[in-house]
Amino acid sequence: MYKKKKSYQSLKNLNTFSINVTAKKIIFVKTIQSLMKIWKTCNLSNIPYIILGEGSNVLFLENYAGVVIINRIKGIRIEEKKKNWLLHVFSGEKWHDLVKYTLRMGFFGLENLALIPGSVGSAAIQNIGAYGLELKNICQYVDVISLENGKTIRLKKKTCNFSYRSSIFKYKYNNGYAVIAVGIKIKKNWKPVIFSSLLKSKKILEINAYKIFNIVCQIRKKKLPNLKKLGNAGSFFKNPIITSKKTKKILSSYMKMPYYIQKNGFIKIPAAWLIEKYNFKNIQIGDAAIYKKQKLILINLKKANSKDILKLAQIIQKCILKKFGIYLEPEVDFINSLGKVKLL
């Protein structure tokens, strides 16, 4: 039925923020059948439940009153087409492990997304992205299962409503559904996705997928905190997307502000730049702080609780709103005793 079942166990090692909260039960599942059986038990008994992968994009606000289901449904199926490789990847696979696997197999195209924490399922839900590439660029379909009747629904890329760090799986296919697999299309005719840090590399003229993978890993290791030492959920805030009018207003005071024009005409501003320009110095709430090497990341120095992190996040939001007129939207999901909630 499931690999492990724990009662009133700490979730500290199951969320990358390392928040020391508990759940009524923690259950690791390895099959779809196990997942459905547990869901039915929770549903019949009116017990709250939540499905997690690697716990890399969540902040637990308090002890969870229900069952935390840890998705360990794994497996990769490969289908060869004339021009592409099609990978059917189950949602419990670790994303970075998938990237390494494709490189070993000689399938190139995922290397820009190396070292992103989390599972394949959460990659689709979140539409992960980095260094010029997003999940939506390589996704063929996403399979979700109705936990009520066991029917699998395949959503092709166009119907997934992928957008900046979001998808249809964050709202419509949320309660009563679970992402079980992601279809990924990798072109045989590989072309590198070039990004600014890559252009600065001396090896740009002899670039290949393996070198891009190594460069991305080096960059991320250099600027991102070690999860084993400093709890965090990666980028705490989304990069704000604002109007050209507001962008021009800010540029009149900050001529060197970086910005990126979107296809719809709106402008994306790096949230890390906004936070850095405010100059919060060494602000710290309890054991919650801003990571010095990447201002977009809030860290748990040792024993921070959710209140510390939330208070720090609120201070940042208020200050950035006052100085730039920009609201920083959280990227992490907040979970209270009954499930996901909207905060900040």
UniProtKB/Swiss-Prot annotation:
Compartments, record wording: Cytoplasm
Enzyme active site: R165, S235, E331
Family named by the database record: Belongs to the MurB family.
Protein name: UDP-N-acetylenolpyruvoylglucosamine reductase
Enzyme Commission code(s) on record: 1.3.1.98
Pathway(s): Cell wall biogenesis; peptidoglycan biosynthesis
One Pfam family matching this protein: MurB_C
GO cellular component, as recorded: cytosol
Molecular function GO terms recorded: FAD binding; UDP-N-acetylmuramate dehydrogenase activity
The protein's enzyme class: oxidoreductase
GO terms, biological process: cell division; cell wall organization; peptidoglycan biosynthetic process; regulation of cell shape
Domain named FAD-binding PCMH-type: residues: 19-189
Gene3D superfamilies, A to Z: 3.30.465.10, UDP-N-acetylenolpyruvoylglucosamine reductase, C-terminal domain, Uridine Diphospho-n-acetylenolpyruvylglucosamine Reductase, domain 2
InterPro entries membership: FAD-bd_PCMH, FAD-bd_PCMH-like_sf, FAD-bd_PCMH_sub1, FAD-bd_PCMH_sub2, MurB, MurB_C, MurB_C_sf, Oxid_FAD_bind_N
Organism: Buchnera aphidicola subsp. Schizaphis graminum (strain Sg)
Lineage: Bacteria, Pseudomonadati, Pseudomonadota, Gammaproteobacteria, Enterobacterales
Cofactor(s) this protein requires: FAD
Role, per record: Cell wall formation.
Keyword rRNA-binding: no
Catalyzed reactions per annotation: UDP-N-acetyl-alpha-D-muramate + NADP(+) = UDP-N-acetyl-3-O-(1-carboxyvinyl)-alpha-D-glucosamine + NADPH + H(+)
Key words, A-Z: Cell cycle, Cell division, Cell shape, Cell wall biogenesis/degradation, Cytoplasm, FAD, Flavoprotein, NADP, Oxidoreductase, Peptidoglycan synthesis
